[in-house]
Each structure stands twice: as structure tokens, then as C-alpha cells.
Design a protein with these regions (language model features):
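Extended, low-hydrophobicity, polar/charged segments
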Residues: 1-199
Length: 199
């Protein structure tokens, strides 16, 4: 057995001695880095994280690391582009309920700011299917790989002051994957080009 396996077995023995039921799961390595990491999670009805595993028990990971296949999207009835009126509809579910759509038929776009060492700030447009959720740990790791700088923080941009200070000429009620770079031209400390990430 490798040293890594021996350490894992030692942890398992300690937990058993303490009377704890644990599951060893794949986990994000975080700031420590490394190709792989194992985390021991105590099984309980309540806690700060979830364990995702296959029915066979051959794979287990925490939410930050888990890999899965998305559910099948519901196809649109036709491929004809059309404008939708969406007054007072601020969420994916509200748009779907009022327009006879399924969340898998909509693209969700979220703005983030990647803050790197040396006050280098990159605006991010993260695009994902409307029935999915953005895993911010995975997004952080992906952005860190895309740039040659050390990523310090990834912040979702939601507050009105930050939006008004850094974004101009936003299309009313629409932030899409094709949002023009001119919308960030007025920002004093953001890069002037969107990094677009589509899943």
C-alpha cells in the first residue's frame, strides 16, 4: 500500500475507534493543491455538506467535487427565435411559469468578478442551463487554470452599487451570453473584456 493509502487507513481506524460512521469521498484540494484529495465525512441527517454517491457505492464525492451527467433537457417545440415579454419576471421559475417553458430551455447568466493578485480584476459571464446551479468552487478552479495569475477571490456581482459603478448600457432585463464588452468600458479597475464560461 502507498503512503497515501496507509494514512487513509489510519484515519478510518481513528474514526472507528471514536464510534463515528464515515465515508471517504473525493474532495476539492483547495489552496493546498494537488491532483486529488480525499475527505472523510461523518454521515448524519444534518450538516454543512452533502455526500453524492452511486447506488453501487463505487463512487462518492462532496458537492464541490462531484461529477455527474445533467438530466435530459426538454426540447423547444420549434427552432424559431421569438421575443418574449417578461414584465416583473425576475427568476427562471417566474419566466418559465408565465411562458410555458421548462428551466432546461433557458440559459442562466451570472456575473462574477475574479480578483487576482496585483489588483487584476476580470469580469466573468458564467452561462449554464436554467435548471442547473453554478458550482462556485469548480468555477473558481476553472478560472484559476485559465489565467496565469493567482486567483484570490471570486465574487458574484449582485449589488446595485457595484453594477451601476462598473456596468453601462445594460440591456433592460436581459444579461445574455453575448453581452457586449462595451458594457464594462466605464469600469475603472476591471479588465475591459468579458471572460465567457459556458457549461
Amino acid at each position: 500500500a502507498s503512503f497515501y493509502e496507509k494514512v487513509g487507513n489510519a484515519y478510518e481506524n481513528i474514526f472507528k475507534s471514536c464510534g463515528l460512521q464515515t465515508v471517504g469521498v473525493e474532495a476539492d484540494s483547495g489552496a493546498i493543491g494537488g491532483a486529488s484529495s480525499k475527505e472523510f465525512m461523518v454521515t448524519a441527517d444534518a450538516g454543512e455538506d452533502s455526500i453524492l454517491f452511486t447506488q453501487s457505492g463505487s463512487y462518492a464525492a462532496n458537492i464541490e467535487k462531484a461529477v455527474s451527467l445533467p438530466s435530459q433537457p426538454i426540447p423547444l417545440k420549434d427552432n424559431i427565435a421569438e421575443w418574449l415579454e417578461t414584465p416583473h419576471q425576475k427568476t427562471i421559475l417566474e419566466v418559465c411559469d408565465n411562458n410555458n417553458l421548462d428551466p432546461s430551455q433557458i440559459i442562466k447568466v451570472v456575473i462574477f468578478l475574479a480578483q487576482f493578485e496585483g489588483e487584476f480584476n476580470v469580469p466573468i459571464l458564467a452561462c449554464i442551463r436554467g435548471d442547473q446551479h453554478i458550482n462556485e468552487v469548480k468555477l473558481f478552479n476553472l478560472i484559476n487554470k485559465l489565467h496565469n495569475f493567482n486567483l484570490l477571490n471570486l465574487k458574484k456581482i449582485e449589488d446595485k452599487n457595484t453594477i451601476e459603478k462598473n456596468l453601462v448600457d445594460l440591456p433592460l432585463g436581459f444579461i445574455g451570453p453575448d453581452l457586449d464588452n462595451k458594457t464594462i468600458k466605464a469600469s475603472s479597475n476591471w479588465e475591459k473584456k468579458w471572460t465567457r464560461i459556458i457549461d
